[in-house]
Amino acid sequence: MFRNYNWFDAKEPISYESEIYAKGLKFQRPQITVDGRHWEQLAVERMTKDAAGYVYGCAGKRETYDKNMESFKKWSIIPNRLIKSGFPDLSTTVFGQKYPFPIALAPVGVQKIFNPEGESGSCAAATREHIPYIISTASATSFEDIEKASGPGERWYQLYWPSNDHQDITISLLNRAKKTGCRVLIVTLDTFILGWRPSDMDNGYDPFLNPDSIGVEHGFSDPVFRKQFKEKHGVEVEENMLEAAKEFAGIVFPGISHDWEDLKFLRKHWDGPIVLKGIMNVPDAKKAVEYGMQGIVVSNHGGRQQDGGVASLTMLPKIVDAVGDKLDVLFDSGVRSGADIAKALALGAKMVLIGRPYVYGLALEGSSGVSHVIRCLLGDLELTLHLSGIVSVKPKDLNRDVLYKEE
């Protein structure tokens, strides 16, 4: 399954703390703070204005984003005492596969605007730290180059779903994802058109429309798109990159949503697990079950798409209660610490996707910065659980009984 990769040959996350203190005895300090509250500010100061606006920016007046962040404070972990056990078991099982840790790197596009290493650096870090890496349709790096950088690591593919007029492009993207080792298909439902993003608009910056391959590399490297572009324009993609970028962006952000019946097309062309990302209410979650999906991600895209929305964490327990025994529920939006991860797992998520934090690590120190963020989050999670007397992330040990809802 994992291409001769010893998936469980991973360091105990808590060991990162010991490593840092040992280096401190030699007067060596971490290149990046271990305090996740400061990653964003440090990274934004390092980035260009356009890059900072893109990753930090949100829809509208940031209300959805703010609700995501505040929602975690509404739940508090209740510790248990005199629980004699080893370090907590952080392993989880999703889509029939056991993983050593309950996190994955969320799909984030255009990563070369944050650091020249781009997606290659991030996926290599995910492999080193034994967690799945989710390839974005908006990657600045091709499937094939990501496969080389990731090596034996676990990869999933996130699809920005072209309209039915471009099913041949969809099939080509899915085939390339399968050929390069992607096991799970994540279908993003909330981004058939980009949201109202003031920071990007104030900068006049849309990374998908620039005359380069950033954000549209999957298109520029796709044989079907390249063939169609040459037939239409009489030139190769490289000879008119501005038009090529505009056309591929229009294909993957078609401006209108698919409907539920269209999922049958994806099932026909993908033989692995299919997961719907962006499910935010119970009726839609039940529909996902009805249409035979293997999982959902409770997510509002980190507040980047729709303003005035409900926090993802607010909806998580309701959705888990409705469908958690019928498919795997994953979660993202607003996660910044080990305690945040613990709370999402306690509310029923089987795995938590990490987005902006690892991008900040990438901006600050490239691939090693991404590893640093992953190790900090997992170390923080393990200590949070251990000090709370919670022996594993399995539902029998980590559930709503360990949480108190603040008034």
UniProtKB/Swiss-Prot annotation:
Residues 28-406 form the FMN hydroxy acid dehydrogenase domain. One of its GO terms (cellular component) is cytoplasm. GO terms for molecular function: FMN binding; lactate 2-monooxygenase activity. A 2-oxocarboxylate binds at residues 54, 160, 197, 304. The active site is at residue 301. Disulfide bonds: none annotated. Its cofactor is FMN. The keyword Nucleotide-binding does not apply. It is found in: Cytoplasm; Nucleus. Keywords: Cytoplasm, Flavoprotein, FMN, Monooxygenase, Nucleus, Oxidoreductase. This is FMN-dependent alpha-hydroxy acid dehydrogenase PB1A11.03. It comes from Schizosaccharomyces pombe (strain 972 / ATCC 24843).
